[in-house]
Design a protein with these regions (language model features):
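N-terminal leader/targeting and pre-domain segments
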Residues: 2-4
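A generic fold-level signal
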Residues: 10, 105, 185-186
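Residue-level recognition of the N-termini of beta-strands and the immediately preceding loop/turn
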Residues: 13, 44-46, 189
Length: 232
């Protein structure tokens, strides 16, 4: 009896999503990138890279940027449909009473740890981090901000917190910051599809609606396929 040869799944392309946990426009983009991840799950692998938007040896209090956010958050809501929570906005409108000192490093380390447990759920975890900050008003520089997410994703607490404070994982987060710079990303959110070698197709720069991102992805994949046919 003759058997049919096993069908191998086509190789997936890599979409790199550059974001920062403290980027309000990335928070607004979260529903878009989550929808993209689901719609293209058979065609794309997605790698989320933290960009290190707010980094300083001595982090500044939220008051330094509060007046800007007081206006900017409304623009993000109007354009994206996302909502910022009252617990987050309390810190923005009461900066003199807030104990927040935003810094991108700890949430970047947290994402780096998470990717080792659930590499296929990077987009969801990044979105959950931003929801914890921007809606629930959790301080991402505080270890306790991550505890509920550890329960949600069933990540061992001791393992997570050991890594969160380790030099090794800090260096891994710093490597991601450097990689984002190497990709010449100058703002967030940014999404790129890797073609061959060091060639990339930009599919989102700044907040971009789903239809536009989807069209850009389709065009990029067609161009990559066409280039492969020409070179073969």
């Amino acid at each position: 009896m003759k058997t049919e040869p096993a069908q191998t799944a086509p190789a997936k392309h890599l979409l790199i999503y550059c974001y920062d946990a403290y980027c309000g426009w990335c928070y607004g983009f979260s529903p878009v990138i989550k929808k993209i991840a689901e719609a293209y799950k058979d065609q794309l692998d997605i790698e989320v890279l933290s960009g290190g938007m707010i980094l300083s040896p001595q982090p500044a209090p939220i008051g330094v940027m509060a007046s800007y956010i007081q206006e900017a958050y409304k623009t993000v809501e109007e354009r994206t449909g996302i909502r910022f929570g009252k617990d987050f906005l309390w810190h923005i409108f009461n900066p003199d009473k807030s104990d927040w000192f935003p810094d991108s490093l700890k949430p970047a380390i947290a994402l780096r740890i998470f990717k080792e447990f659930y590499p296929d759920d990077q987009v969801s975890f990044a979105a959950d981090l931003q929801y914890a900050l921007n809606y629930e008003g959790r301080d991402l520089t505080d270890d306790e901000a991550y505890r509920l997410l550890l329960h949600q994703y069933q990540i061992p607490e001791n393992d997570f917190y050991d890594k969160l404070h380790s030099k090794e994982y800090e260096q891994k987060a710093q490597y991601e910051f450097a990689l984002v710079k190497q990709l010449k990303v100058t703002g967030f959110p940014t999404a790129l599809i890797q073609a061959e070698g060091l060639k990339f197709h930009m599919v989102a720069r700044g907040y971009t609606d789903y239809e536009t991102v989807s069209r850009n992805i389709d065009n990029a994949l067609k161009e990559i396929l066409h280039s492969g046919v020409k070179s073969s």
